[in-house]
Amino acid sequence: MWHTAKITVDTEHYCTSTTQMAMAQMYGVIFDHEPKNKTMLCACPGTELHEMGARMVADLFENDGWDTIYLGAAVPKNALLESVRMNQPDLIALSVTMPQHLIDCKKVVDAIREEFPDVKIAVGGKAFESTDEIWKKWLIDLYTNDAREFLKRANEIVMDK
């Protein structure tokens, strides 16, 4: 909302940190589902700092029984690839809010596809909403701007190990 001058940057940061604290306090209360033996790695690639949506998606998957590896904001390509090597996720979810970070996201997608051609890749975030479905050209397995739909479709495309 700061980019439309509805609130200031400091107000946005305050609201974000308050929301993150509330989410963290709920963590032990809501995550009690049967494990699904599926792993999802979630990150904001490059210099993307807006991680709230990615955090919420990771928590939604965790609540559904997935193991989640949440790397957070501004994850460099090489660090993300190393995490994929170590954790061997079934699904990699990349979140981009600001359009200028789409280039970094594309580089990460290309690197993942080159080294891990069979892993499922999903993208999401506000930046993709005005791109005329650019994700379709990126060999992406899943895109939606709805978290519940994302979880439903992820469960369909990722089979049990």
Where do the PLM segments sit?
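Long amphipathic alpha-helical segments
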Residues: M1-F31
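Conserved hydrophobic helix-helix packing surfaces used for dimerization/oligomerization
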Residues: K38-M40
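Short hydrophobic segments within beta-strands
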Residues: A43-P45, S95
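A general structural motif
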Residues: G46, H50-M52, L71-N78, I103-D104
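Short helix-loop-beta junction
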Residues: R55-I69
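Cofactor-cradling patches in redox/metallo enzymes
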Residues: L60-N63, V75-E133
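Residue-level detector of anion-binding/catalytic polar loops
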Residues: D67, D90, D141
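Peripheral docking tails and interdomain loops at the edges
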Residues: A127-K161
